Regions:
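Aromatic-anchored glycine-rich loop motif in surface-exposed flexible loops
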Residues: 1-45, 49, 234-236
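Hydrophobic-face positions in mid-chain alpha helices that act as interaction patches
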Residues: 6-10, 14, 29, 54, ...
Length: 240
């Protein structure tokens, strides 16, 4: 319902001593698209950047695609996802990785469009109670991956995401918790290698454009385009 309460909108940078009220969902979407249209105008003629820490027009297109998908405006979502892929449709081939290679998500990945930096999501998902170290807490994470999500990876060892996105390990210890097997996050293995250049938190990747376009195409009745996009993405995620 576009008239339902959304979030309060604050469009000024200065502090105001006032209570804010929630704007409607429609007002929030209108403001987000207004900001993205301005970003589009400002960035459309800029040169291609050589690092991921500043947004360019490709990042604008991807975020527009995401917003239009949320709004169920399938035609616009597909249009902007295709604009992303016109600029960059490269994908990381998981078939080229090994478990010793390191992180799936890196600054130099062909998929990387924009990153806000190396926030370690692993410190809240892996370490005990969000501790800022690995050490003694390696088997006592705050969160594990749900059984429902693990079950969604239903192609077994052929699905390389089960090797590089998540991993199974024994959790618990003799004092804090009983031992049990569980699945943990591993796209960015900050606990193993220290500071990371990117995180999947606020990371824009070309893979999202494929998924946005496929979903939007399916909803517009273009099943052929949706299947082709998913197949192309799967080719980079499944064993050859």
């Amino acid at each position: 319902n576009r008239t339902s309460p959304g979030v309060p909108l604050k469009t000024t940078s200065y502090v105001e001593d006032k209570e804010y009220t929630m704007n409607s969902v429609d007002e929030v979407y209108t403001q987000v698209l207004k900001d993205l249209d301005l970003a589009d105008t400002c960035l459309v003629n800029t040169t291609i950047k050589n690092h991921p820490y500043r947004a360019d027009i490709t990042a604008v297109y991807l975020l527009k695609s995401r917003i239009y998908l949320y709004m169920q405006n399938w035609e616009k979502a597909l249009e902007y996802a295709q604009k992303v892929m016109t600029k960059n449709k490269s994908l990381l081939d998981l078939n080229t990785l090994t478990t010793e290679t390191g992180d799936v998500l890196t600054k130099s990945s062909p998929e990387t469009i924009f990153s806000m930096g190396g926030h370690l999501l692993a410190s809240s998902l892996i370490m005990k109670y969000g501790e800022n170290r690995w050490g003694d807490w390696e088997a006592l994470p705050s969160y594990t991956i749900s059984d429902d999500l693990v079950a969604a990876f239903d192609e077994g060892e052929n699905d390389l995401r089960t090797q590089y996105y998540i991993f199974k390990t024994t959790l618990g210890d003799d004092y804090y918790a009983p031992y049990a097997d569980g699945w943990l996050f591993r796209k960015v293995r900050g606990w193993e290698y220290g500071y990371k250049e990117v995180s999947d938190n606020f990371l824009f990747r070309t893979a999202e454009a494929y998924l946005n376009a496929a979903e939007a195409a399916a909803y517009t009745g273009d099943e052929g385009t949706a299947r082709n996009l998913l197949k192309e993405l799967r080719d980079y995620r499944m064993i050859d």
